[in-house]
Amino acid sequence: MIYHEIYDVIVVGGGHAGTEAALAPARMGLKTLLLTHNVDTLGQMSCNPAIGGIGKGHLVKEIDAMGGLMAIAIDQAGIQFRTLNSSKGPAVRATRAQADRVLYRQAVRTALENQPNLDIFQQEVVDILVENNRAVGAVTKMGLTFKARSVVLTAGTFLAGKIHIGLDNYAGGRAGDPSATMLADRLRDLNLRVDRLKTGTPPRLDARTINFDVLAKQHGDAELPVMSFMGAVDLHPRQIPCYITHTNEQTHDLIRNSLDRSPMYTGVIEGSGPRYCPSIEDKVMRFSDRNSHQIYLEPEGLSTIEVYPNGISTSLPFDVQMGIVNSMKGLEKTRIIKPGYAIEYDYFDPRDLKPTLETKAIEGLFFAGQINGTTGYEEAAAQGLLAGINAALQVQGKEAWFPTRDLAYTGVLVDDLCTLGTKEPYRVFTSRAEYRLLLREDNADIRLTPIAHELGLIDDARWARFNQKMENIERERERLKQIWIHPQSEHLAVVNELVNSPLTREASGEDLLRRPEVTYDKLTQVAAFAPALDDKQAAEQVEISIKYQGYIEHQQNEIERHKRHENTLIPAEFDYDKVESLSNEVRAKLMQHRPVSIGQASRISGITPAAISILLVNLKKQGMLKRGEL
């Protein structure tokens, strides 16, 4: 049976990638359908109850700057907010929020149900409809076919998912949910490279059986941050602390003595796990010189007794999990509510994707989230947003859009995936970005909101707020330029208390703010420079843009030099076989990856600077040398 209505975009999956992928085209005015196996798990936090962190918080800010949902949802659901690396430079400062799972899921579902142009339908998808090498719809388990002009697949860990607890295993997409076996089988028939990855989750603990009195307490920041540029502190629910315990030698001995019952160490699990979120088995074996690992006990919400022990992800048998938990301080009598487990699932080689996240093999079919080899809610959501945007643009007959590495962490993420691929679950770090001083959390809206406005992704209120902020920044910078303090000034004594070395010549407000020891807050407490802006976001931007102006300009100059070749396009029809001076190995890699630009080609493993020079010469010789906006 074919559904009577034809959609512009169909999104398969209602996780963090799927929700952003569905909201984007709907906001752009396209008729969108979100297909999910269970509407009650829309926006479900399957693993850790937190959003943000190093690199991840940057992604959340970028999603928000483009009108996405994640930051707004966590502002309504965050029960502990912290700014990480607050004592370091602005490039690596990151916001992290502990979440109430129920409140977060409610915020996501409310947003989806109130979004114009978006329909939601509960049914498992078993097939992607492909005609003339183009995705044109999705088929559900009940035999109902939905037709569309583009399809975004965000299946998470559900494709041929297999859950492991000890040496026992069974099919499942996550605990309590079935595996998408039929869809996985169908996708394996397509012209796409597929492999297996693994991830895991710790057991959930009963808070009533934890002795919190003997544990170190960790509070959130006294001055609460917000995640969304449109957010406000009064949107946050009640704030509560987390607690800290540690593994010990008893814990480690138990783990070492149980490896013969571990699915990872007996070869039952073949997929690679996340390097930067290893299981407790891996931590004990890889860091054998350490006799203790820190474990964070994170409440799962305000209305639940469940506690997430961050740091003991495991697939060991249940009796071993009980022993691990009870071996730690404060957890001697703790009960487990849900066992930890590992899950193995299909993912597709992201090198088979265009930077728009459209598959190279099938037109109109976009992939986003964990099926591209990533790990993390934030990475999934960023991909979902990008895939949804490009699915919509394709339907509208408009030029595709994706961010470059110097524009957004989303650009770094996608370029890494599409160019290098991954053999283990990929996560974002600030260290992956060459231009991280320009890709800060605080300026994500300055980088991306004007683009979002052009694409039709943001509403009038956000656009007005953005323009007001930009006016405030410009006006305040100009004001500080115009105010001067000289050696005879009546305010000199107060100013000299702020600076490490007394003023010997006149200085403007901008000059003073460039000094490392002078902050905007301190400067504007001096009568000559008062009053301070009441717009905190604009005030922060004024201080950073002045204090780091020289570094920012240097990095921008670097980008301009790099862009001379970064954006030199390689036409899809370019024939590498005709470039005889390339080695067979280089030629094979270029033909395999089909990079869209010289910049992308230069990041492929094994492609030398000499090979890039040869490519440029041949592009020029064939009259194909042209630069474009990527």
From Swiss-Prot:
It is found in: Cytoplasm. InterPro entries: FAD/NAD-bd_sf, GIDA_C_N, MnmG, MnmG-rel, MnmG-rel_CS, MnmG_C, MnmG_C_subdom, MnmG_C_subdom_sf. Its main location: cytoplasm. It comes from the Bacteria. One of its GO terms (cellular component) is cytosol. Belongs to the MnmG family. This is tRNA uridine 5-carboxymethylaminomethyl modification enzyme MnmG. The gene is mnmG.
